[in-house]
Amino acid sequence: FIFLFCLGILCSFPMQGQQRDTQKEYNVDSTLYAYYMRCKAEVSSPIVMQMSDTLFLMAEEQGDQRMQAVALCNKLDYYYYKNNQPDSINHYVEIVKDFAKKTNQPKYYYFAWSKRLINYYIKQHQNNIALYEANKMMQEAEQEQYMDGIANAYNVLSSIYQLKRLYSLAIDNKKKEIEITLEYGLDKYNLSTTYSMLGGLYSLTGKT
């Protein structure tokens, strides 16, 4: 039950910024956006790899580095959802992180690290590796004072501690995630879900 509850938590967090209306939110070129949607529809098919290369080049011509990062994330997502090629997941996590670092896009840097690499380890019950990566990510985000990265670290730490049945630590990290989101005015798109998750953690302890 506990693993299924936590797995539901992981699945409830799609790529933030892609699930909403990307075209309006980021003022994406209509042709580029239409092709992005075609790529998104093929994320479970090997063809998405070639399509993502095309999307990357189209975005480069438009000078849209954000969509270039999205194109690389599409490749990562293909292997992430296949869930059986850890070397490929690690490879594309590093590709996304490297491009995001070079183009000053920390959102995608920490997305690849937390929502893909660490969540993959969590799904594989490799909680000690996930914890190592989460603590390393927290340290880097704190050094950079990147609050969204810190919030992401609290998010995955909560999931890891939950699977380890360390519910007090899971609750503490979930509360810190909420606190930093509110204090620094971070993206509140999933905040109601986060509160629900906190309630679920309290229910596991028998507390209200």
PLM-predicted stretches and their roles:
Residues 2-12:
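Bacterial N-terminal signal peptides
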Residues 18-208:
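A "functional boundary" signal
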Residues 13-17:
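Sec/Tat signal peptide C-region and signal peptidase I cleavage site
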Residues 1-2, 147:
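Accessible peptide chain termini
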